[in-house]
Amino acid sequence: MLSKIDINAINFCSLVFFITFVLLIINNNQTETLNMATIKPFRGIRPPKELVEKVESRPYDVLNSEEARAEAGDNEMSLYHIIKPEIDFPVGTSEYDACVYEKAAANFKKFKDNGWLVQDDKDHYYIYAQTMNGKTQYGLVVGAWVNDYMEGRIKKHELTRRDKEEDRMKHVRVNNANIEPVFFAYPDNATLNELIMRYAATNPEYDFIAPIDGFRHRFWIISDDADMKVITEEFAKMPSLYIADGHHRSAAAALVGAEKQKNNPNHTGDEEYNYFMAVCFQASQLTILDYNRVVKDLNGLSSQQFIDALKQNFDVEDKGKDIYKPTSLHNFSLYLDGKWYSLTAKEDTYDNTDPIGVLDVDISSRLILDNILGIKDLRSDKRIDFVGGLRGLEELKRRVDSGEMRMALALYPVTMQQIMDIADSGKIMPPKATWFEPKLRSGLIIHSLD
């Protein structure tokens, strides 16, 4: 028989084993939680309902200084005075001059002092809906965690340039705010979709048709604590969020947040600077348009020599004078000498297991632009230009027919799944691969870092 000492020893070992097992479960759950997306609601700074159409604007990086100057006109409430403040200086003033950043901060203060921008009195999530050509995409406006970006849970698919990062970092620092949101995608989620649709059936806070793009923009405020809890919990189940558009803004916002963490001796992790503003859309709702190429010459080849060279890697079909649009992945449209051609990549020219090599932007860059036309660097070669967004194939035809360009190449749009696959693999998309539309309007909401 076992002695009392033996029994006590067994009981003690069992207790130790049980406690160890429980601690392992707790630690595992904490690790899983830390490896999921973290978001929070925030007190948005927004224009009053009656002023939103005066304040709102296109994002800073889709127009130049003179276009911003023209669009702002005599409207002193235009957000361009904050995001393109060089328009308040004589023509030719560099947008990177120190006085321009200082003007942005002065104008931001002026907007708040004048009541053109007002901070909400409590934390909210928000819903931002955009309707283009009858299709609506619904985004959740959230505070995204800086650490998620720094540790790779917010995934990117483009390279960023340090000079552009520093420009946006200066803008964030001087305003102590994320003036413009970044554009995220997340895997489809039925619970979040149901919640969003419930709000979408109610009257929005904002509802307007934007000038120039002509798209409808609507905005709702989520005040219910239970709904906000659901949103936070559903995002906490997602291992990753994906930057769709705004890689430089994302990097700048996260890097400034990380700076503030480092420089604050009393940092707790609860400060507002630990988060930056993002609008998160379900991946399946997003629209990616084709991003096409026009080239100045055929690298010394005649038209027939160029076509013959293409036939080594593509099935080439003459489509005549009517505009031809690519019909599927790996099908391209060529415009040359007033005629359209269908180019279909032969199956041995790409590897379906390679997330980069299977992309049409990579296939066309390797087999046409590089191998035949000698264009090695899409970012720096002056012989090539890019036509994206809503301009359509008519713009390709116009630029070739005008004599400005020799040929045009149209691509089938990249899919959101391809982008997520590349981001998940830790790789980078080739340059000039994605064009999201519609763009986020700026000025609907701002996130303070205080």
What are the roles of these predicted feature ranges?
Residues 35-450:
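Surface-exposed, charge/polar-rich loops and edge strands
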